[in-house]
Amino acid sequence: MFRILLADDEGIMLESLKHIIATSFGSECDIRCVKTGRAVVEMAESFHPDIAFVDIHMPGLSGIQAIQEIRKVNNEMIIIIITAYDKFAYAKEAVNLGVMEYLTKPISNKKVILDVCMKAMQRVEEARQKRSDDLKIRERLEIVVPMIESGFIYSMLQDRS
């Protein structure tokens, strides 16, 4: 299951994104929608999305400001900017904040959204797998280290005899 946050002050854009993702991925996704930068930050804290599609210009906090706040506590969320603004300064700031993609509106082909979404989902899966593998290694070390330590102590005692 992927938790996806959609943030845009344009209701039609939110509904379009939600429809594209929901019809393509169905029950694989839990999708939440917000319309302000502040709501992005609050939803990031309570919903813990894996992936966020964020517009830059929203009421209150901008998308960039919201991402800055989120990055203070969460560097793992995959963020995709979707905006009508293609100014270099915005793109540069987005890259500095670690966004995965910077898409400009209007997006005329839903395949672009689906490709970006699948790429983000793949990254989430890879991160989950890495976390799982790391935990397995730690669990094994918790078992092996005491065995090695006791074997070392035993061999030290044997050498002294």
Task: Say what each PLM segment does.
Residues 25-35, 43, 91:
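Short hydrophobic/Thr-rich beta-strand motif most characteristic of the beta2 strand and flanking loop
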Residues 11-32:
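Two-component/phosphorelay signaling modules centered on CheY-like receiver
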Residues 18, 33-43, 62-66:
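Helix N-cap/capping motif at the beta->alpha junctions
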Residues 8, 55:
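Active-site residues of response regulator receiver
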Residues 4, 47-53:
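Active-site beta3 strand of CheY-like receiver
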Residues 95, 99-161:
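Interdomain helical linkers/hinges and coiled-coil/dimerization scaffolds
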Residues 58:
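Receiver (REC) domain active-site loop signature in two-component systems and cognate sites
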